[in-house]
Protein backbone atom coordinates (compact mmCIF):
# COMPACT_ATOMS: atom_id res chain seq x y z
CA UNK A 1 0.00 0.00 0.00
CA UNK A 2 1.24 3.45 -0.86
CA UNK A 3 2.60 5.49 2.04
CA UNK A 4 2.27 8.81 0.24
CA UNK A 5 -1.17 10.07 -0.77
CA UNK A 6 -2.81 13.32 -1.77
CA UNK A 7 -4.70 15.29 0.87
CA UNK A 8 -8.33 16.19 0.30
CA UNK A 9 -9.34 19.84 -0.28
CA UNK A 10 -10.89 20.22 3.18
CA UNK A 11 -7.67 19.17 4.94
CA UNK A 12 -5.55 21.38 2.68
CA UNK A 13 -7.72 24.39 3.51
CA UNK A 14 -7.40 23.79 7.25
CA UNK A 15 -3.63 23.47 7.01
CA UNK A 16 -3.41 26.67 4.96
CA UNK A 17 -5.72 28.44 7.40
CA UNK A 18 -3.35 27.54 10.21
CA UNK A 19 -0.60 29.57 8.54
CA UNK A 20 -2.76 32.69 8.21
CA UNK A 21 -5.18 32.40 11.15
CA UNK A 22 -3.23 31.84 14.33
CA UNK A 23 -5.76 33.47 16.67
CA UNK A 24 -8.64 36.00 16.51
CA UNK A 25 -6.13 38.85 16.27
CA UNK A 26 -4.91 37.36 12.97
CA UNK A 27 -8.44 37.63 11.58
CA UNK A 28 -8.76 41.25 12.71
CA UNK A 29 -5.43 42.08 11.06
CA UNK A 30 -6.35 40.51 7.72
CA UNK A 31 -9.79 42.13 7.59
CA UNK A 32 -8.51 45.61 8.48
CA UNK A 33 -5.74 45.33 5.89
CA UNK A 34 -8.33 44.41 3.26
CA UNK A 35 -10.36 47.47 4.27
CA UNK A 36 -7.33 49.74 3.97
CA UNK A 37 -6.46 48.30 0.55
CA UNK A 38 -10.06 49.02 -0.50
CA UNK A 39 -9.47 52.74 0.08
CA UNK A 40 -11.56 53.04 3.24
CA UNK A 41 -11.60 56.30 5.19
CA UNK A 42 -13.56 54.94 8.16
CA UNK A 43 -13.09 51.48 9.69
CA UNK A 44 -14.99 50.06 12.67
CA UNK A 45 -13.77 47.00 14.60
CA UNK A 46 -16.12 45.25 17.03
CA UNK A 47 -15.29 42.17 19.12
CA UNK A 48 -16.90 40.11 21.87
CA UNK A 49 -15.02 38.04 24.47
CA UNK A 50 -11.60 38.27 22.86
CA UNK A 51 -12.97 37.79 19.34
CA UNK A 52 -13.50 34.06 19.79
CA UNK A 53 -17.31 34.09 19.40
CA UNK A 54 -17.65 37.30 17.38
CA UNK A 55 -15.63 39.73 15.24
CA UNK A 56 -17.01 42.39 12.92
CA UNK A 57 -15.05 44.76 10.68
CA UNK A 58 -16.95 47.39 8.67
CA UNK A 59 -15.61 49.95 6.21
CA UNK A 60 -16.63 52.53 3.61
CA UNK A 61 -14.21 51.33 0.93
CA UNK A 62 -14.85 50.56 -2.73
CA UNK A 63 -16.94 47.46 -2.03
CA UNK A 64 -17.48 44.50 -4.39
CA UNK A 65 -20.01 43.33 -6.96
CA UNK A 66 -21.73 39.95 -6.75
CA UNK A 67 -19.10 38.04 -8.77
CA UNK A 68 -16.15 39.45 -6.79
CA UNK A 69 -17.93 38.76 -3.50
CA UNK A 70 -18.02 35.04 -4.35
CA UNK A 71 -14.49 34.95 -5.80
CA UNK A 72 -13.09 36.62 -2.69
CA UNK A 73 -13.53 33.34 -0.78
CA UNK A 74 -11.58 31.32 -3.34
CA UNK A 75 -7.98 30.55 -2.40
CA UNK A 76 -5.40 32.70 -4.22
CA UNK A 77 -8.09 34.97 -5.66
CA UNK A 78 -6.92 38.58 -5.35
CA UNK A 79 -7.27 42.02 -6.92
CA UNK A 80 -3.79 43.08 -5.76
CA UNK A 81 -1.52 41.30 -8.27
CA UNK A 82 -1.90 39.64 -11.68
CA UNK A 83 1.46 37.95 -12.33
CA UNK A 84 4.71 36.97 -10.64
CA UNK A 85 6.31 40.21 -11.86
CA UNK A 86 4.00 42.15 -9.52
CA UNK A 87 5.61 40.42 -6.52
CA UNK A 88 8.63 42.68 -6.91
CA UNK A 89 6.67 45.93 -6.63
CA UNK A 90 3.94 45.23 -4.08
CA UNK A 91 2.21 48.40 -2.91
CA UNK A 92 -0.70 46.90 -0.95
CA UNK A 93 -0.94 45.28 2.49
CA UNK A 94 -2.40 42.05 1.13
CA UNK A 95 -1.63 40.26 -2.12
CA UNK A 96 -1.75 36.47 -1.68
CA UNK A 97 -5.52 36.07 -1.83
CA UNK A 98 -5.50 33.67 1.13
CA UNK A 99 -7.05 35.71 3.94
CA UNK A 100 -10.80 35.30 3.42
CA UNK A 101 -10.48 31.69 2.29
CA UNK A 102 -8.42 30.84 5.38
CA UNK A 103 -10.76 32.68 7.75
CA UNK A 104 -13.85 31.06 6.21
CA UNK A 105 -12.27 27.59 6.50
CA UNK A 106 -12.27 27.73 10.32
CA UNK A 107 -15.30 29.89 11.16
CA UNK A 108 -18.77 31.10 10.14
CA UNK A 109 -18.45 34.19 7.95
CA UNK A 110 -21.11 36.63 6.74
CA UNK A 111 -20.12 39.21 4.12
CA UNK A 112 -22.24 42.20 3.08
CA UNK A 113 -20.85 44.51 0.42
CA UNK A 114 -21.93 47.11 -2.16
CA UNK A 115 -20.11 49.08 -4.83
CA UNK A 116 -20.52 52.82 -5.41
CA UNK A 117 -23.71 53.51 -7.38
CA UNK A 118 -25.12 49.97 -7.08
CA UNK A 119 -28.84 49.64 -6.26
CA UNK A 120 -28.38 46.55 -4.09
CA UNK A 121 -25.62 44.95 -2.14
CA UNK A 122 -24.56 41.31 -1.96
CA UNK A 123 -24.71 39.01 1.05
CA UNK A 124 -22.59 35.85 1.18
CA UNK A 125 -22.60 33.32 4.05
CA UNK A 126 -19.74 30.81 4.29
CA UNK A 127 -19.44 28.02 6.89
CA UNK A 128 -16.30 25.93 7.18
CA UNK A 129 -15.15 27.01 3.73
CA UNK A 130 -18.45 26.28 1.92
CA UNK A 131 -20.79 28.95 0.54
CA UNK A 132 -24.21 28.21 2.06
CA UNK A 133 -26.06 31.39 1.10
CA UNK A 134 -25.83 34.12 -1.55
CA UNK A 135 -28.50 36.83 -1.76
CA UNK A 136 -28.99 40.49 -2.51
CA UNK A 137 -29.36 42.86 0.42
CA UNK A 138 -29.62 46.48 1.37
CA UNK A 139 -26.40 47.91 2.82
CA UNK A 140 -24.14 50.95 2.69
CA UNK A 141 -21.25 51.31 0.25
CA UNK A 142 -18.23 49.38 1.38
CA UNK A 143 -17.88 46.08 3.12
CA UNK A 144 -18.97 44.49 6.40
CA UNK A 145 -17.65 41.09 7.51
CA UNK A 146 -18.86 39.18 10.58
CA UNK A 147 -16.81 36.22 11.82
CA UNK A 148 -18.34 33.86 14.40
CA UNK A 149 -17.12 30.82 16.34
CA UNK A 150 -13.44 30.89 15.42
CA UNK A 151 -11.95 27.37 15.12
CA UNK A 152 -15.39 25.77 15.59
CA UNK A 153 -14.31 22.85 13.38
CA UNK A 154 -10.73 22.55 14.67
CA UNK A 155 -11.13 21.91 18.41
CA UNK A 156 -7.41 21.23 18.83
CA UNK A 157 -6.63 24.79 17.68
CA UNK A 158 -9.42 26.30 19.77
CA UNK A 159 -8.10 24.54 22.87
CA UNK A 160 -4.84 26.48 22.61
CA UNK A 161 -6.48 29.90 22.58
CA UNK A 162 -5.91 31.97 25.71
CA UNK A 163 -8.47 33.59 27.98
CA UNK A 164 -10.73 36.21 26.32
CA UNK A 165 -8.87 39.00 28.14
CA UNK A 166 -5.54 37.78 26.71
CA UNK A 167 -6.94 37.42 23.19
CA UNK A 168 -8.34 40.95 23.52
CA UNK A 169 -4.83 42.19 24.29
CA UNK A 170 -3.54 40.62 21.07
CA UNK A 171 -6.34 42.31 19.15
CA UNK A 172 -5.73 45.77 20.63
CA UNK A 173 -2.06 45.35 19.74
CA UNK A 174 -2.98 44.66 16.10
CA UNK A 175 -5.48 47.54 15.95
CA UNK A 176 -2.97 49.94 17.52
CA UNK A 177 -0.30 49.09 14.95
CA UNK A 178 -2.73 49.57 12.08
CA UNK A 179 -3.99 52.88 13.50
CA UNK A 180 -0.40 54.12 13.60
CA UNK A 181 0.27 52.95 10.06
CA UNK A 182 -2.63 54.89 8.55
CA UNK A 183 -3.39 58.15 10.38
CA UNK A 184 -5.46 59.24 7.37
CA UNK A 185 -8.03 56.55 8.27
CA UNK A 186 -10.45 57.01 11.17
CA UNK A 187 -10.53 53.86 13.33
CA UNK A 188 -13.30 53.05 15.79
CA UNK A 189 -12.68 50.19 18.21
CA UNK A 190 -15.52 48.62 20.22
CA UNK A 191 -14.84 45.86 22.73
CA UNK A 192 -17.67 43.98 24.44
CA UNK A 193 -20.11 46.68 23.26
CA UNK A 194 -18.05 49.48 24.87
CA UNK A 195 -16.31 52.11 22.79
CA UNK A 196 -12.55 52.02 23.50
CA UNK A 197 -11.30 54.80 21.23
CA UNK A 198 -11.76 56.67 17.96
CA UNK A 199 -8.95 58.19 15.92
CA UNK A 200 -9.60 61.35 13.95
CA UNK A 201 -8.40 60.23 10.53
CA UNK A 202 -6.98 63.71 9.88
CA UNK A 203 -3.61 62.32 8.72
CA UNK A 204 -1.71 63.66 11.74
CA UNK A 205 0.33 60.81 13.23
CA UNK A 206 1.09 62.86 16.36
CA UNK A 207 -2.65 63.08 17.04
CA UNK A 208 -2.96 59.28 16.80
CA UNK A 209 -0.05 58.83 19.23
CA UNK A 210 -1.70 61.22 21.69
CA UNK A 211 -5.01 59.33 21.48
CA UNK A 212 -3.43 55.89 21.89
CA UNK A 213 -0.55 56.48 24.33
CA UNK A 214 -1.40 59.67 26.19
CA UNK A 215 0.48 62.86 26.87
CA UNK A 216 3.55 61.34 28.60
CA UNK A 217 4.72 59.67 25.40
CA UNK A 218 3.47 62.42 23.11
CA UNK A 219 5.14 65.30 24.96
CA UNK A 220 8.55 63.59 24.98
CA UNK A 221 8.74 62.98 21.23
CA UNK A 222 11.48 64.37 19.01
CA UNK A 223 10.76 64.75 15.31
CA UNK A 224 13.33 63.98 12.61
CA UNK A 225 13.20 63.42 8.87
CA UNK A 226 15.36 62.41 5.94
CA UNK A 227 14.68 62.44 2.22
CA UNK A 228 16.60 61.34 -0.85
CA UNK A 229 15.60 60.48 -4.39
CA UNK A 230 14.16 57.07 -3.53
CA UNK A 231 14.00 57.04 0.28
CA UNK A 232 11.91 59.10 2.69
CA UNK A 233 12.02 58.83 6.48
CA UNK A 234 9.95 60.36 9.24
CA UNK A 235 10.92 59.37 12.76
CA UNK A 236 9.28 60.32 16.04
CA UNK A 237 11.54 59.16 18.85
CA UNK A 238 11.09 59.59 22.59
CA UNK A 239 13.74 61.48 24.51
CA UNK A 240 16.27 59.40 26.39
CA UNK A 241 14.40 59.90 29.69
CA UNK A 242 11.51 57.84 28.26
CA UNK A 243 12.76 54.26 27.92
CA UNK A 244 11.41 50.77 28.44
CA UNK A 245 12.56 47.26 29.35
CA UNK A 246 11.53 45.86 25.94
CA UNK A 247 10.89 46.94 22.35
CA UNK A 248 7.11 47.07 22.62
CA UNK A 249 7.14 50.83 22.08
CA UNK A 250 9.06 50.59 18.81
CA UNK A 251 6.92 50.71 15.68
CA UNK A 252 8.48 50.40 12.21
CA UNK A 253 6.43 51.06 9.07
CA UNK A 254 7.67 50.57 5.52
CA UNK A 255 5.33 51.77 2.77
CA UNK A 256 2.46 51.74 5.25
CA UNK A 257 3.12 48.20 6.47
CA UNK A 258 4.10 47.38 10.06
CA UNK A 259 7.28 45.32 9.90
CA UNK A 260 10.04 43.81 11.98
CA UNK A 261 13.56 44.13 10.68
CA UNK A 262 16.90 43.58 12.42
CA UNK A 263 18.59 46.36 10.48
CA UNK A 264 16.06 48.95 11.68
CA UNK A 265 16.30 47.71 15.28
CA UNK A 266 20.10 47.78 15.16
CA UNK A 267 20.15 51.33 13.78
CA UNK A 268 17.87 52.57 16.59
CA UNK A 269 19.94 50.77 19.23
CA UNK A 270 23.18 52.19 17.87
CA UNK A 271 21.83 55.75 17.69
CA UNK A 272 20.62 55.66 21.30
CA UNK A 273 23.57 53.60 22.55
CA UNK A 274 25.20 56.21 24.79
CA UNK A 275 21.97 58.04 25.60
CA UNK A 276 20.01 55.41 27.53
CA UNK A 277 21.05 52.69 30.00
CA UNK A 278 22.00 49.20 28.86
CA UNK A 279 19.05 46.85 28.21
CA UNK A 280 16.61 49.75 27.97
CA UNK A 281 14.85 50.72 24.74
CA UNK A 282 13.46 54.04 23.46
CA UNK A 283 10.00 54.76 22.09
CA UNK A 284 10.29 55.05 18.31
CA UNK A 285 7.69 55.57 15.58
CA UNK A 286 9.48 55.15 12.25
CA UNK A 287 7.86 55.70 8.85
CA UNK A 288 9.72 54.83 5.67
CA UNK A 289 8.72 55.26 2.05
CA UNK A 290 10.93 53.38 -0.37
CA UNK A 291 10.75 51.98 -3.88
CA UNK A 292 8.89 48.63 -3.48
CA UNK A 293 11.47 47.02 -5.76
CA UNK A 294 14.11 47.57 -3.06
CA UNK A 295 12.31 45.44 -0.46
CA UNK A 296 11.06 41.86 -0.26
CA UNK A 297 7.86 41.32 1.74
CA UNK A 298 7.13 37.86 0.33
CA UNK A 299 9.06 36.04 3.07
CA UNK A 300 6.36 34.79 5.45
CA UNK A 301 2.55 34.47 5.25
CA UNK A 302 2.17 37.08 8.01
CA UNK A 303 4.16 39.58 5.86
CA UNK A 304 5.69 40.79 9.13
CA UNK A 305 9.34 40.41 8.19
CA UNK A 306 10.95 42.17 5.25
CA UNK A 307 14.37 42.38 3.64
CA UNK A 308 16.07 45.41 2.11
CA UNK A 309 18.22 45.09 -0.99
CA UNK A 310 20.76 47.50 0.57
CA UNK A 311 20.73 46.93 4.34
CA UNK A 312 23.81 49.10 5.01
CA UNK A 313 22.28 52.15 3.33
CA UNK A 314 19.09 51.80 5.36
CA UNK A 315 21.07 51.40 8.59
CA UNK A 316 23.09 54.54 7.94
CA UNK A 317 20.03 56.63 7.02
CA UNK A 318 18.08 55.67 10.15
CA UNK A 319 21.11 55.95 12.44
CA UNK A 320 22.09 59.41 11.19
CA UNK A 321 18.52 60.75 11.25
CA UNK A 322 17.99 59.77 14.89
CA UNK A 323 21.47 60.84 15.96
CA UNK A 324 20.97 64.29 14.43
CA UNK A 325 17.67 64.73 16.29
CA UNK A 326 19.31 63.82 19.60
CA UNK A 327 21.78 66.66 19.07
CA UNK A 328 19.01 69.22 18.49
CA UNK A 329 16.99 68.76 21.67
CA UNK A 330 17.62 69.66 25.30
CA UNK A 331 17.85 66.28 27.03
CA UNK A 332 18.47 67.39 30.63
CA UNK A 333 15.85 65.54 32.70
CA UNK A 334 13.92 67.78 35.07
CA UNK A 335 13.22 66.25 38.46
CA UNK A 336 9.47 66.00 39.03
CA UNK A 337 8.64 66.52 42.67
CA UNK A 338 5.11 65.38 43.40
CA UNK A 339 3.15 66.19 46.50
CA UNK A 340 2.07 63.13 48.47
CA UNK A 341 -1.67 62.62 48.68
CA UNK A 342 -3.93 60.76 51.03
CA UNK A 343 -4.92 57.57 49.23
CA UNK A 344 -8.59 58.54 49.65
CA UNK A 345 -7.97 61.80 47.79
CA UNK A 346 -6.38 60.26 44.71
CA UNK A 347 -8.51 60.58 41.61
CA UNK A 348 -8.21 58.35 38.57
CA UNK A 349 -7.20 60.49 35.59
CA UNK A 350 -9.37 60.33 32.49
CA UNK A 351 -8.46 61.20 28.94
CA UNK A 352 -11.12 62.97 26.93
CA UNK A 353 -11.72 61.83 23.39
CA UNK A 354 -11.77 65.51 22.49
CA UNK A 355 -8.34 66.23 24.02
CA UNK A 356 -6.76 69.50 23.02
CA UNK A 357 -4.12 68.74 20.45
CA UNK A 358 -0.55 69.53 21.37
CA UNK A 359 1.65 70.52 18.47
CA UNK A 360 4.96 68.69 18.39
CA UNK A 361 6.95 70.28 15.60
CA UNK A 362 8.54 73.56 16.59
CA UNK A 363 9.25 76.42 14.26
CA UNK A 364 12.82 77.05 13.18
CA UNK A 365 12.99 80.00 15.56
CA UNK A 366 11.84 77.89 18.51
CA UNK A 367 14.34 75.17 17.64
CA UNK A 368 17.14 77.72 17.53
CA UNK A 369 16.11 79.05 20.94
CA UNK A 370 16.05 75.48 22.28
CA UNK A 371 19.58 74.84 21.00
CA UNK A 372 20.83 78.03 22.65
CA UNK A 373 19.23 77.09 25.94
CA UNK A 374 21.95 74.73 27.06
CA UNK A 375 24.77 76.92 25.73
CA UNK A 376 23.57 79.76 27.95
CA UNK A 377 22.69 77.48 30.84
CA UNK A 378 25.41 78.59 33.18
CA UNK A 379 25.87 82.28 32.35
CA UNK A 380 24.68 83.47 35.76
CA UNK A 381 26.05 86.14 38.04
CA UNK A 382 29.67 86.21 39.17
CA UNK A 383 29.81 84.68 42.64
CA UNK A 384 33.00 83.92 44.58
CA UNK A 385 33.25 80.46 46.11
CA UNK A 386 33.56 80.33 49.86
CA UNK A 387 36.73 78.70 51.12
CA UNK A 388 34.83 76.15 53.18
CA UNK A 389 32.59 74.99 50.33
CA UNK A 390 35.28 73.25 48.30
CA UNK A 391 38.45 71.76 49.72
CA UNK A 392 41.71 71.74 47.81
CA UNK A 393 42.75 68.13 47.96
CA UNK A 394 45.25 67.49 45.21
CA UNK A 395 46.91 64.60 46.99
CA UNK A 396 43.77 62.48 47.06
CA UNK A 397 42.55 63.52 43.62
CA UNK A 398 42.75 61.00 40.80
CA UNK A 399 41.89 63.68 38.25
CA UNK A 400 44.79 65.97 39.23
CA UNK A 401 47.27 63.36 38.00
CA UNK A 402 45.65 63.45 34.57
CA UNK A 403 45.82 67.20 33.92
CA UNK A 404 49.25 67.09 32.30
CA UNK A 405 48.09 64.46 29.81
CA UNK A 406 45.41 66.85 28.54
CA UNK A 407 47.86 69.72 27.97
CA UNK A 408 48.17 69.32 24.21
CA UNK A 409 44.51 68.44 23.80
CA UNK A 410 43.39 71.42 25.88
CA UNK A 411 45.73 73.78 24.02
CA UNK A 412 43.98 72.91 20.75
CA UNK A 413 40.57 73.62 22.27
CA UNK A 414 41.69 76.87 23.87
CA UNK A 415 42.91 78.21 20.52
CA UNK A 416 39.37 77.90 19.24
CA UNK A 417 37.36 78.72 22.35
CA UNK A 418 39.81 80.73 24.47
CA UNK A 419 37.61 83.77 25.14
CA UNK A 420 34.43 81.72 25.41
CA UNK A 421 35.98 79.32 27.93
CA UNK A 422 37.26 82.20 30.07
CA UNK A 423 33.79 83.71 30.16
CA UNK A 424 32.17 80.41 31.12
CA UNK A 425 34.67 79.81 33.91
CA UNK A 426 34.04 83.23 35.41
CA UNK A 427 30.27 83.08 35.05
CA UNK A 428 29.38 79.74 36.61
CA UNK A 429 28.60 79.37 40.27
CA UNK A 430 29.69 76.03 41.68
CA UNK A 431 27.92 75.60 45.00
CA UNK A 432 29.85 72.54 46.15
CA UNK A 433 29.97 68.76 46.06
CA UNK A 434 27.70 66.16 47.60
CA UNK A 435 28.95 62.80 48.89
CA UNK A 436 32.23 63.43 47.01
CA UNK A 437 30.33 62.26 43.94
CA UNK A 438 27.94 64.97 42.75
CA UNK A 439 28.77 68.55 41.77
CA UNK A 440 26.07 71.14 42.50
CA UNK A 441 25.85 74.21 40.24
CA UNK A 442 23.47 77.15 40.51
CA UNK A 443 22.22 79.32 37.67
CA UNK A 444 19.47 81.88 38.24
CA UNK A 445 16.34 79.98 39.39
CA UNK A 446 17.61 76.47 38.58
CA UNK A 447 20.27 74.31 40.16
CA UNK A 448 21.93 71.36 38.46
CA UNK A 449 23.40 68.20 39.95
CA UNK A 450 26.22 66.62 37.95
CA UNK A 451 27.57 63.09 38.43
CA UNK A 452 31.35 63.60 38.34
CA UNK A 453 32.13 60.07 37.12
CA UNK A 454 29.49 60.16 34.37
CA UNK A 455 30.63 63.64 33.29
CA UNK A 456 34.32 62.67 33.12
CA UNK A 457 33.40 59.44 31.34
CA UNK A 458 31.55 61.43 28.66
CA UNK A 459 34.51 63.81 28.23
CA UNK A 460 37.00 60.96 27.86
CA UNK A 461 34.71 58.99 25.56
CA UNK A 462 34.48 61.87 23.09
CA UNK A 463 38.23 62.53 23.37
CA UNK A 464 39.11 58.89 22.70
CA UNK A 465 36.61 58.72 19.84
CA UNK A 466 38.17 61.73 18.12
CA UNK A 467 41.66 60.28 18.60
CA UNK A 468 40.73 56.70 17.68
CA UNK A 469 42.67 56.68 14.42
CA UNK A 470 45.83 57.87 16.20
CA UNK A 471 45.78 55.95 19.48
CA UNK A 472 49.09 56.30 21.29
CA UNK A 473 50.87 53.05 22.06
CA UNK A 474 53.85 52.20 24.21
CA UNK A 475 56.30 49.35 23.94
CA UNK A 476 56.31 47.31 27.12
CA UNK A 477 59.61 46.86 28.95
CA UNK A 478 58.87 43.23 29.68
CA UNK A 479 56.70 41.37 27.15
CA UNK A 480 53.29 40.45 28.56
CA UNK A 481 52.22 36.84 28.00
CA UNK A 482 48.49 36.20 27.62
CA UNK A 483 47.20 32.62 27.58
CA UNK A 484 44.11 32.06 25.46
CA UNK A 485 41.74 29.23 24.68
CA UNK A 486 42.21 27.76 21.16
CA UNK A 487 38.98 29.38 19.94
CA UNK A 488 40.03 32.75 21.38
CA UNK A 489 43.45 32.49 19.77
CA UNK A 490 41.82 31.93 16.38
CA UNK A 491 39.56 34.93 17.01
CA UNK A 492 42.51 37.15 17.97
CA UNK A 493 44.31 36.33 14.71
CA UNK A 494 41.11 36.89 12.76
CA UNK A 495 40.65 40.35 14.28
CA UNK A 496 44.34 41.31 14.36
CA UNK A 497 43.82 44.46 12.28
CA UNK A 498 41.10 45.72 14.62
CA UNK A 499 43.19 44.97 17.72
CA UNK A 500 46.14 46.82 16.17
CA UNK A 501 43.89 49.85 15.68
CA UNK A 502 42.94 49.64 19.34
CA UNK A 503 46.63 49.90 20.24
CA UNK A 504 47.65 46.26 20.73
CA UNK A 505 50.64 44.85 18.84
CA UNK A 506 51.23 41.16 19.53
CA UNK A 507 52.72 37.96 18.18
CA UNK A 508 52.11 34.27 18.77
CA UNK A 509 54.21 32.64 21.51
CA UNK A 510 53.10 29.00 21.21
CA UNK A 511 50.98 26.78 23.45
CA UNK A 512 47.90 28.98 22.89
CA UNK A 513 49.76 32.05 24.15
CA UNK A 514 50.51 35.44 22.64
CA UNK A 515 52.98 38.16 23.65
CA UNK A 516 51.86 41.79 23.85
CA UNK A 517 54.67 43.98 22.46
CA UNK A 518 52.80 47.31 22.44
CA UNK A 519 49.74 48.42 24.42
CA UNK A 520 47.52 51.54 24.27
CA UNK A 521 48.29 54.46 26.57
CA UNK A 522 45.24 55.89 28.32
CA UNK A 523 45.70 59.12 30.25
CA UNK A 524 49.42 58.47 30.54
CA UNK A 525 48.97 54.94 31.88
CA UNK A 526 49.50 51.80 29.77
CA UNK A 527 46.44 49.55 29.76
CA UNK A 528 47.67 46.04 29.12
CA UNK A 529 46.60 42.52 29.94
CA UNK A 530 43.17 42.89 31.55
CA UNK A 531 41.81 45.35 29.01
CA UNK A 532 43.03 43.08 26.19
CA UNK A 533 41.19 40.12 27.75
CA UNK A 534 38.05 42.26 28.13
CA UNK A 535 38.23 43.16 24.43
CA UNK A 536 38.56 39.49 23.45
CA UNK A 537 35.48 38.70 25.55
CA UNK A 538 33.57 41.41 23.70
CA UNK A 539 34.63 39.86 20.41
CA UNK A 540 33.38 36.46 21.59
CA UNK A 541 29.97 37.88 22.47
CA UNK A 542 29.36 39.06 18.92
CA UNK A 543 27.57 36.62 16.64
CA UNK A 544 28.06 39.04 13.76
CA UNK A 545 30.86 41.42 14.72
CA UNK A 546 29.89 45.02 14.11
CA UNK A 547 33.23 46.77 13.83
CA UNK A 548 31.80 50.22 14.52
CA UNK A 549 29.91 48.97 17.56
CA UNK A 550 32.91 47.04 18.88
CA UNK A 551 35.17 50.06 18.51
CA UNK A 552 32.63 52.14 20.41
CA UNK A 553 32.21 49.55 23.16
CA UNK A 554 35.94 49.40 23.77
CA UNK A 555 36.26 53.17 23.81
CA UNK A 556 33.45 53.20 26.38
CA UNK A 557 35.34 50.59 28.39
CA UNK A 558 38.55 52.63 28.27
CA UNK A 559 36.73 55.84 29.23
CA UNK A 560 35.03 54.13 32.18
CA UNK A 561 38.30 52.71 33.52
CA UNK A 562 40.12 56.05 33.18
CA UNK A 563 37.41 58.38 34.50
CA UNK A 564 37.39 59.91 37.95
CA UNK A 565 35.31 57.71 40.27
CA UNK A 566 32.59 58.37 42.81
CA UNK A 567 34.06 59.30 46.22
CA UNK A 568 37.14 60.86 44.57
CA UNK A 569 37.68 64.26 46.18
CA UNK A 570 38.11 66.92 43.50
CA UNK A 571 39.74 70.29 43.98
CA UNK A 572 38.09 73.54 42.95
CA UNK A 573 40.43 73.74 39.96
CA UNK A 574 39.54 70.21 38.86
CA UNK A 575 35.81 70.82 39.17
CA UNK A 576 36.06 73.94 37.03
CA UNK A 577 38.05 72.00 34.44
CA UNK A 578 35.66 69.06 34.45
CA UNK A 579 32.70 71.35 34.07
CA UNK A 580 34.18 73.39 31.24
CA UNK A 581 35.20 70.24 29.36
CA UNK A 582 31.67 68.91 29.73
CA UNK A 583 30.08 72.03 28.26
CA UNK A 584 31.92 71.62 24.96
CA UNK A 585 31.11 67.94 24.48
CA UNK A 586 28.76 66.91 21.72
CA UNK A 587 26.41 65.20 24.18
CA UNK A 588 26.66 66.61 27.71
CA UNK A 589 23.47 64.90 28.86
CA UNK A 590 24.44 61.24 29.35
CA UNK A 591 27.49 59.10 29.97
CA UNK A 592 28.45 56.55 27.26
CA UNK A 593 26.38 53.91 29.08
CA UNK A 594 23.28 56.09 28.82
CA UNK A 595 23.04 57.19 32.47
CA UNK A 596 22.22 60.87 33.10
CA UNK A 597 25.18 63.20 33.58
CA UNK A 598 23.11 66.14 34.75
CA UNK A 599 19.65 66.73 36.22
CA UNK A 600 17.81 69.97 36.91
CA UNK A 601 15.69 71.13 39.85
CA UNK A 602 13.92 74.48 39.69
CA UNK A 603 13.45 77.01 42.47
CA UNK A 604 9.69 76.68 42.00
CA UNK A 605 9.83 72.95 42.68
CA UNK A 606 11.73 73.51 45.92
CA UNK A 607 9.34 76.23 47.02
CA UNK A 608 6.43 73.86 46.44
CA UNK A 609 8.11 71.25 48.64
CA UNK A 610 8.55 73.80 51.45
CA UNK A 611 4.99 75.10 50.93
CA UNK A 612 6.23 78.58 50.06
CA UNK A 613 3.93 78.43 47.06
CA UNK A 614 0.90 76.22 46.58
Curated annotation (Swiss-Prot):
One of its GO terms (biological process) is mismatch repair. One of its GO terms (molecular function) is ATP binding. The keyword Protein transport does not apply. Transmembrane segments: none annotated. Keywords: DNA damage, DNA repair. Pfam families: DNA_mis_repair, HATPase_c_3, MutL_C. CDD domains: HATPase_MutL-MLH-PMS-like (cd16926), MutL_Trans (cd00782). One of its GO terms (cellular component) is mismatch repair complex. HAMAP family: DNA_mis_repair. NCBIfam families: mutl. Belongs to the DNA mismatch repair MutL/HexB family. This protein is involved in the repair of mismatches in DNA. It is required for dam-dependent methyl-directed DNA mismatch repair. May act as a 'molecular matchmaker', a protein that promotes the formation of a stable complex between two or more DNA-binding proteins in an ATP-dependent manner without itself being part of a final effector complex. This is DNA mismatch repair protein MutL. It comes from Thermoanaerobacter sp. (strain X514). The lineage of its organism: Bacteria, Bacillati, Bacillota, Clostridia, Thermoanaerobacterales.
Amino acid sequence: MNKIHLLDEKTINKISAGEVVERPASIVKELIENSIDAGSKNITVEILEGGIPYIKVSDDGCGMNEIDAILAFERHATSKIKSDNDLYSIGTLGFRGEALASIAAVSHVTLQTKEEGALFGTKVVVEGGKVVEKTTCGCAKGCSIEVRDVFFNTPARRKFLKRPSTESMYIIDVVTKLCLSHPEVSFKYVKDRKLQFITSGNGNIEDVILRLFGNEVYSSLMSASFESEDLKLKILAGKNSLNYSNRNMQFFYVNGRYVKNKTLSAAVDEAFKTYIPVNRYPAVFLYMEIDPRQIDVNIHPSKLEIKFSDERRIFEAVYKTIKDSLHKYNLIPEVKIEEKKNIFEIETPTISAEQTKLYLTSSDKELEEEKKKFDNEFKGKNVFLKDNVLKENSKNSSLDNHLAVYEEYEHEKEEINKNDLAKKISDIRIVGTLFSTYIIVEKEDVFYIIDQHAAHERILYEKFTSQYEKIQTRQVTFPIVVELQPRDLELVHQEKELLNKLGYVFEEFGNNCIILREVPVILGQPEARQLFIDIVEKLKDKELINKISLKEENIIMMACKAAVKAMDNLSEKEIHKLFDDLKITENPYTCPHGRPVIIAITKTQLEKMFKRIM
